[in-house]
């Protein structure tokens, strides 16, 4: 995933979840693909997915447990994880504020 997105359309209205503890902005790239750039503040959260997602951590660290799994996996800045469509995952922030880029595939 690129560190910088060129030639995008940015949606000004933020996506705000969990009383402002998770915030993202949607961008649409030149191919029409949707991405979100966001922040996840310390805490534990559960998310559902409609489309498949690729999450890349830009800063911070977390633990993730995908639906149907019993084990948690640790991720840090520069690492990615994939979430299937029509699924869910749990995430616990373990270091700092997680900054992320999410691509919908």
PLM region spans:
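A short, N-terminal "cap"/entry segment at the start of jelly-roll beta-barrel domains
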Residues: 1-33
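Conserved short histidine dyad/triad with adjacent acidic residue
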Residues: 28-50, 80-85
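A structural signal for the main folded, soluble domain(s) of proteins
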Residues: 46, 66-71, 92
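Short hydrophobic/aromatic-rich beta-strand segments that constitute the beta-sheet cores
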Residues: 47, 64, 100-102
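Short, conserved beta-strand element in jelly-roll/cupin
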Residues: 49-64
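Short acidic-glycine-tyrosine-enriched beta hairpin
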Residues: 69-86
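Ligand-binding loop in jelly-roll beta-barrel domains
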Residues: 84-105
């Amino acid at each position: 995933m690129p560190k910088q997105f060129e030639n995008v359309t940015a949606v000004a209205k933020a996506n705000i979840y969990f009383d402002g503890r998770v915030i993202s902005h949607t961008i649409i790239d030149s191919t029409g693909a949707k991405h979100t750039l966001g922040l996840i503040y310390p805490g534990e959260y559960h998310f559902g997915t409609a489309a498949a997602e690729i999450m890349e951590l830009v800063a911070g660290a977390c633990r993730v447990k995908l639906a149907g799994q019993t084990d948690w996996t640790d991720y840090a800045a520069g690492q990615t994880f994939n979430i299937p469509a029509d699924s869910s995952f749990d995430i616990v922030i373990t270091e700092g504020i997680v900054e992320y880029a999410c691509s919908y595939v």
